[in-house]
C-alpha cells in the first residue's frame, strides 16, 4: 500500500479512537512504523503534525459534547484524554478563543475553531447557498427520543425511517415534498444524553388524505444556509454529519437558535416497502451572518 493509503486508513482509525489513549508510540505501533517515520510520513501526506491534529480533533469532539450534552466539563476533559480540567480549559481556549463554560452557555453556536477530519482521496465538499425563508405553516407530528452522543448518528437514521413510516402509514402514495424539522438539546434527566425533537410534516395544502392526527406546525422564517443531497435516503445522515463537521467550519458560520430543516423531494411516488428510495434533500441550518 502506498503512503497515502496507509495514512488514509490511519485517519479513519484515529477518528474512531479519539477517546482512547493515543500516544505516538501507540499510533506508530498500530501503523507498523517507528514513531519518527510515522510522524514524517503523516506530515508529508497531510501537511499536518500528527500530535497537533489529534489534539485539535479531540477538542472539536469535546466542543460538540459541550453543546449537545450536560456532561460536567471535567468528565468531557477526561474522556478526551486531558489530564485535568485546567489543562483542557487552556487548550480549549487556545483553539476556540473562549472557555469551555462560555462556549456551552452561548445562545448561538459558532463553527469557529472546529477542526474538520482530514480526508484523503475522492471527496467533494457539498455546495451551499444562502436563502431567506418566510414563515411557512405546515401540518405535522412531533416525536422525541433521547440518546447518548455516541449513539446519535445511528439513532437519527433509525428514527427517521420509523417516524416517516408512522407518519405516512395511511397514505396511498408518497407526497411530492416532505419536511423534517429537527431540534436537539441536552437531556434534562441524564447529563450524558441529549433529547431530540423531530417533526414530520407536510405543507397544509398537501396534508389532506395523507396523514392523521397532525397538528399545525410553523416553519420559522429567517436566514439559512442550504446544502443539497441527492441519492438514497440511507445516505442522508452521513451527509448531515459532513455538513456540520466539515462545511460549517470551512464557511466559519454561526448557527442561531432554531430548527434544522430537512426538505425532501422523493424521486418515486410509490411506496417501496423496506427498500430505501431515491430522493433529493435540501438541508437548511438557521444562521446569523
From Swiss-Prot:
One Gene Ontology molecular-function label: sequence-specific DNA binding
SUPFAM superfamilies on file: Homeodomain-like, Probable bacterial effector-binding domain
Keyword field: DNA-binding, Repressor, Transcription, Transcription regulation
Induction of its expression: Transcription is slightly reduced by salicylic acid, and significantly reduced by decanoate.
Residue ranges annotated for the HTH araC/xylS-type domain, each copy included: 8-106
Pfam family, one: HTH_18
Gene3D superfamilies: Homeodomain-like, Regulatory factor, effector binding domain
GO-annotated biological processes: regulation of DNA-templated transcription
DNA-binding region: 25-46, 73-96
Miscellaneous comment in the UniProt entry for this protein: Overexpression of Rob confers resistance to cyclohexane.
Name of the protein in its database record: Transcriptional regulator Rob
Species this chain originates from: Salmonella typhimurium (strain LT2 / SGSC1412 / ATCC 700720)
Amino acid at each position: 500500500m502506498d503512503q497515502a493509503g496507509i495514512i488514509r486508513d490511519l485517519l479513519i482509525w484515529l477518528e474512531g479512537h479519539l477517546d482512547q489513549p493515543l500516544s505516538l508510540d501507540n499510533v506508530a505501533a498500530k501503523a507498523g512504523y517507528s514513531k519518527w517515520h510515522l510522524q514524517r510520513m503523516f506530515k508529508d501526506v497531510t501537511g499536518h503534525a500528527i500530535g497537533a491534529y489529534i489534539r485539535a480533533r479531540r477538542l472539536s469532539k469535546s466542543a460538540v459534547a459541550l453543546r449537545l450534552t450536560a456532561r460536567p466539563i471535567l468528565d468531557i476533559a477526561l474522556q478526551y484524554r486531558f489530564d485535568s480540567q485546567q489543562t483542557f480549559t487552556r487548550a480549549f481556549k487556545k483553539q476556540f478563543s473562549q472557555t469551555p463554560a462560555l462556549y456551552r452557555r452561548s445562545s448561538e453556536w459558532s463553527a469557529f475553531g472546529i477542526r474538520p477530519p482530514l480526508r484523503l482521496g475522492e471527496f467533494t465538499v457539498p455546495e451551499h447557498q444562502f436563502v431567506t425563508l418566510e414563515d411557512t405553516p405546515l401540518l405535522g407530528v412531533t416525536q422525541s427520543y433521547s440518546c447518548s452522543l455516541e449513539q446519535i448518528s445511528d439513532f437519527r437514521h433509525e428514527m427517521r425511517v420509523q417516524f416517516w413510516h408512522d407518519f405516512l402509514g395511511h397514505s396511498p402514495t408518497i407526497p411530492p415534498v416532505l419536511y423534517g424539522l429537527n431540534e436537539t438539546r441536552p437531556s434534562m434527566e441524564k447529563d450524558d444524553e441529549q433529547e431530540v425533537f423531530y417533526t414530520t410534516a407536510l405543507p397544509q395544502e398537501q396534508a389532506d388524505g395523507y396523514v392523521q392526527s397532525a397538528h399545525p406546525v410553523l416553519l420559522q422564517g429567517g436566514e439559512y444556509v442550504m446544502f443539497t443531497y441527492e441519492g438514497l435516503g440511507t445516505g442522508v445522515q452521513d451527509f448531515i454529519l459532513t455538513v456540520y463537521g466539515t462545511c460549517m467550519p470551512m464557511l466559519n458560520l454561526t448557527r442561531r437558535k432554531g430548527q434544522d430543516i430537512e426538505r425532501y423531494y422523493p424521486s418515486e411516488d410509490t411506496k417501496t416497502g423496506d427498500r430505501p428510495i431515491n430522493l433529493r434533500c435540501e438541508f437548511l441550518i438557521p444562521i446569523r451572518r
